[in-house]
Amino acid sequence: HGYMYTGFQPQITYTTPALGGFSASAGIFDPNKFAGDETKDPGFQAMANYDWASGAAKGSLWAGAIHQRTSGAGSFNASGFELGAKIGIGAFEAVAYGFDASGLGLSTVGALYLSPFGKTDGKGYFVQTTYTVGKTKFGINFGENRDSGGALADTNKFRSATVGVYHSLNKYITLVGEYNQEKGDGDDLFAGDLKTRTISVGGILMF
């Protein structure tokens, strides 16, 4: 919710050498068959990053773009742009991100190949803050995606908010506790609002 999924995905990629914290990547990907519908042209994606550090502060800026022409019943160009920033000062860290897209839908996966709503306009944003005390990190985030236009009768929206606690036992195991609340609305997708609340407790094993 609030971001372009799944991030950078080209199968053939060129990445520039890092220069003063700046780097860029560009590539192509070709999902030539997606649940029965074909794409005649490969997709293109590019990403630029800038990382910096000064004393106790450090941060990153990034921007990305994606484009692919879809085929099938009702061809169109699908494209999107994203911009994000991350900053950390001591134990505090924050992330802000936003995107604007055309023909990518709410999930931005598959470029709406199978969508009955045609080429729609999407946008979204995501914000997150965390604070670390010892081996325990506390975090909260909120994100929202909106989709409108095309054959949609309404503006479809998904929102999600999460509060979490993450405790590192060692370099391999992190204990996790989260509360998440999601809401979706839009007459094209739901016969009324969709609301879910989830409490999850578990662990992350890294190896």
Regions found by a protein language model. Name each.
Residues T162-N180:
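C-terminal closing repeat unit and adjoining cap/tail of repeat-based domains
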Residues D41, A46-V163, H167:
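Detector for outer-membrane/organellar transmembrane beta-barrel domains
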